[in-house]
Structure formats: structure tokens, C-alpha cells
Amino acid sequence: KNRANANKLMGRFLYGLKKKADYAVISLAGGQKDNAITRECTVEFLTDAVEDVNTYAKELQSQIREEYTGSDENITIEVKAEGTVTSQVLHPTSQEKIVFYLQNVPFGIQKMSGTIKGLVETSTNIGILKTSENEVMGSSSIRSSVETARDSLSDKIAYLTEFLGGEYERQGVYPAWEYRKDSPLRDKMVEVYEEMYGQKPNVVAIHAGLECGLFYKKMEGLDCVSLGPDMKDIHTSEEVLSISSTERVWKYLVKVLEALKE
């Protein structure tokens, strides 16, 4: 849906700002979940050029809103001056590396499927950015239906991180699960759906991390299908689940299990 990621926009803001004013970053914070597109990101920094910062923020906000017209056009860059303070700041070299990282770390769709029209094959999202006493940490979620593509993208982020002197840790990896052209289970589920609702279901391949991949990896040749209720604004802070749809899915699943028992 061409949603903007606040962590990536922060990299753009800080990179552009250094051309307008001197500043020293105290801390960065954005996002709570690595698989949710970050809606807010905050930076604290010291500067003597408050007016220049305000002017630049307004200019960049206007540019970004224009770029995201129709998809995420209410983006806001808010500047608050807190007065004179004394604080620890990042070393200039560390600050430069972090801005470089945010500007260059991959985000969004990296490759579309070559076999299924309109399906995203590989994507990534930098969903968390936070500062502790002696480090700045970024966390990205990588998804792909092709394991080698997933690993290649992971390597790219690792290389960027390590090149800048950081450490990269890979965790929570789940297996890719490729679309199966012939699926008796899927055929049975379509049959049950038609019997219940008098119409064909819309069977699609989606770009998501699912438990099916874990079972598929452990059980060679497993035929599996994922189903679920209607959801909107998935992987954003506005994500919602339809309760009435959940009830329908439950009743449908019961019927599918009964049909498989026959």
C-alpha cells in the first residue's frame, strides 16, 4: 500500500539536516514490532540552529506528503525545542554511521514473484529502532517465499551492519513455503466452501510469514493451506480483526474437518 516507514524517513531527515545545520544526536526511538511498519520515530539532538531545523522540517514534510499522495499523505514532522540542556551525545563518527545505515538499510518490496502475478516474493521492514546507554539497535523483519532470496537479503543487511562496525544477529527464522500447484486439501476446502456459501472462494497466494512453513519444513510433501478471518491494516498500529468473520471461519473450519474425516 506504499506506506511510509518512520524509521527510514528519520534517516532521510537526519541526512538532509546535516546539510542545513550542525547537530549532535542524543537518542533515537521508533517502533515496537519488527514486522509492523513504523508509524512514529523520535530523535533527540542538540543544536544551535533551531530556526534552520524548523524550516527544513517543513520543507521535507511537504516533499514527503507529495510523494505519498493517495497512500500516506498525512505524514507529520514535528519539532519541539526543549530549551538549553546538557546531555551525552553520540560520537560524531557513530552518528554518521547510524544515519548512513538508516539511509541505506533495505525496506519494502525487494522482489515480486515470477510465477504468481501480483504476489510479493521478498520484502523487509526495519520496524524497531532504539537507543540504550552504549548502543543503537535496529531490528528488521525479512520475508520471502524463497529461502535463498531470504538469506541473500539477510546477508545484505548483515554486510551493511558489519561494514559500519556493528554486530548482526539473526533470529526467529521461519522456513519459506512455496505455492503448491496441485493440492488435494485445497480442492476439498474449496468444495466445502461452495457447499456452505454457494460460490467459489477466492484462493490466493499471499506474502506473509505463516506457521505452515514450519510444518512444511519438518514434514516433507505436506499438503497445507492457511485460512483466517478478515483483517485490515495488517502490520500497522491500526490493525483490526473482524469478529463476525472469525465466527464464519470457525464454522467453516469445523465443516472442513468433518469432510476430511469422511
Language model segments and positions:
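Midchain, well-structured core segments that form catalytic/ion-binding scaffolds
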Residues: 1-143
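Catalytic cores of large soluble enzymes that bind and process phosphate-bearing ligands
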Residues: 2-5, 49, 90, 114, ...
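Short glycine/threonine-rich loop-to-helix capping motif typified by GTGT followed
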Residues: 35-42, 88-93, 178-191, 214-218
